Each structure stands twice: as structure tokens, then as C-alpha cells.
């Protein structure tokens, strides 16, 4: 039991701390294991805790303000590169994209106030909004052109009254969705977690609401946020096959529907967590993926033979390469977040 718990912890822990205790056997080297179903439950539980920890969540979000299918479909069309699979691989600074749907307040026929809340779950700390755009749906009488003023309101000192930071003027001549790129004042407000906009019709008296906010036309802000960090590309190691007992990568798939997370995780449907298992003879210690040259293997074998009294037990089968998980999900404010969670997928295993 203890051996299997240590194994599962090792699978999800950073590779830099995989150092076996002196005189002890590595927990991934074929010691006593749990029953297959118990091991599966343990790995699923650890996968859930790992995702929540890396999203800075104490528990899975509860959707108090569900988004309609029509609004979700419209919003996703404006995301750049919605993930089709679970893996991404690049060397860019890590970024995420957030879609925040508006809460409407203090509105009249000719003026609409929109409030947007940006959670700090995933983007806590050094987040910086790089781009932000307002998407809103306008319904106008035919053959008319109206001027729309968009005001960016920010909180004053000590979070007191809202004050005008900047404003934009738009000529709107057709019904439908319209996009307004937002400048640094609005981006700074998004970075701080809250943005308030006022949309005002200039020189016109509307007979009915021009800015629609129903289920299918709910305004939203799409923001691109820089989080920091880089992904590294590593070569693949050896996959477990048949009855092999050597260090290898064992495939393990986490199905979000199976664990009851499909309501708040939009994409993907699951991901390949994988883990490392198998024995590590001393002569292949320190060889990532057991893929070093024959000459290196010979040198390590000679080193092992000259180590008096040394037995196989000081080297562990550990992850040597990981990849991020690309996730599209609802946060606790019902915003849609697209982000890459680093080090979630074990790509290769080797002996420490």
C-alpha cells in the first residue's frame, strides 16, 4: 500500500525531486502494488488534485450562472485556436485566453452598463492582459446609422466611485455582432479583475433596447493574458509493452466524464496522464529513456561492478519529460478560460 502511494505521488511530482532515500527501494521499481481498481481510483484522485492545484482552486467550480449553448457557441468562435486535443508543444511564453460574459446593471433604453469579472484562479500573481476586445450585438432599424459611445469606467482611489478612464466612438450602421478592440486602460482594469463599460447612444432616441443582452446575444470580453513560463520539448522514452519489467512509460487516460467533470471542463474530453514504472539496474542509472549510447552503458556497467556491496535499489524510474495540458473550462465566475497547464502529461521515463 505504502509503496503504491509513493509511486502515484512520484508520478505527479516534479521530476527534479525524484531522489530515492538511502538504503531504501525505489517505489516505482516493482514493489507490492494495490489491486488494479484501487490503483486506478488512486491515480484518478491524484489527477483531480493536480489539476485543481495548478488552477489555484480548492474545489471544482460550481456553475451558478450557466451560459447558454448559443452564447457559448458564439464565444468559442472568437477564441484563437480552440484546443482539439490535450497536448500542446512550443517555446512561447505561456498564455491563456479568458472570455468573460457581461452582467448588466443601471441600464436604460439609450444606455447600457456592462460589468465583467475576471477570476484570479489560473492567472494569479503576475498576470498581464495583452489584448482585450468587446463583443456586443446591436439591433437597429433598417437603413440607419447610429453613433455609439463606449466609456471605460475604473474605480477611484480606495475603491470608491467609478471614474471615466477613456471612451470610444463607433459608427454603427448594421444589426449584428460588433467588435471593439479595447486599449490599455481597459486592459489594466481586466488585469485587476474587474471591468465596467457604459454603452451610450449619441443623438438618438431609441424606441427599444439597441444593445441586446439575451441568452444568445450576451455581450462578452475576450482577453488574452500572459502568464509566464515556457514549455520544453523532450524526446520520447520507452513505452511499456507485454511483460517487460524495465523502466518504461505506462499509458493512463483520465476521462473527465467518468470523474464527473464534463460540466465545467469544455475541452478536451480527457487527457493521457501516463506514469513511470519498472526496474532500474544500476548500470542504466541516469540514462533518460534508457536511450544513451552503447559506450555510456558500458561505462555505467563498469562503474556498477566496481561499487562494492551495491544492489539494485538506489535508482528510480521517473518522468524525464512532460508536456502541458491544453484546457478550456469555466472558472468560478462562469468565465470561459483557455490555458495550458504545465507538466501534466508524462512523455518519457528514465532511471534517475
UniProtKB/Swiss-Prot annotation:
Chief place where the protein resides: secreted
Range of residues in the leader sequence: 1-18
Superkingdom of the source species: Eukaryota
One Pfam family linked to the record: TGF_beta
SMART domains: TGFB
CDD domains registered for this protein in UniProt: TGF_beta_INHBC_E
Cellular compartment(s): Secreted
Keyword Secreted carried by entry: yes
GO terms assigned for molecular function: cytokine activity; growth factor activity; hormone activity; transforming growth factor beta receptor binding
Keywords annotated in UniProt: Cleavage on pair of basic residues, Disulfide bond, Glycoprotein, Growth factor, Hormone, Secreted, Signal
Subunit annotation: Homodimeric or heterodimeric through association with alpha and beta subunits, linked by one or more disulfide bonds. Inhibins are heterodimers of one alpha and one beta subunit. Activins are homo- or heterodimers of beta subunits only.
PANTHER family: INHIBIN BETA C CHAIN, TGF-BETA FAMILY
Biological role: Inhibins and activins inhibit and activate, respectively, the secretion of follitropin by the pituitary gland. Inhibins/activins are involved in regulating a number of diverse functions such as hypothalamic and pituitary hormone secretion, gonadal hormone secretion, germ cell development and maturation, erythroid differentiation, insulin secretion, nerve cell survival, embryonic axial development or bone growth, depending on their subunit composition. Inhibins appear to oppose the functions of activins.
Name of the molecule in the record: Inhibin beta C chain
Species whose genome carries this gene: Homo sapiens (Human)
Lineage: Eukaryota, Metazoa, Chordata, Craniata, Vertebrata
Recorded name of the encoding gene: INHBC
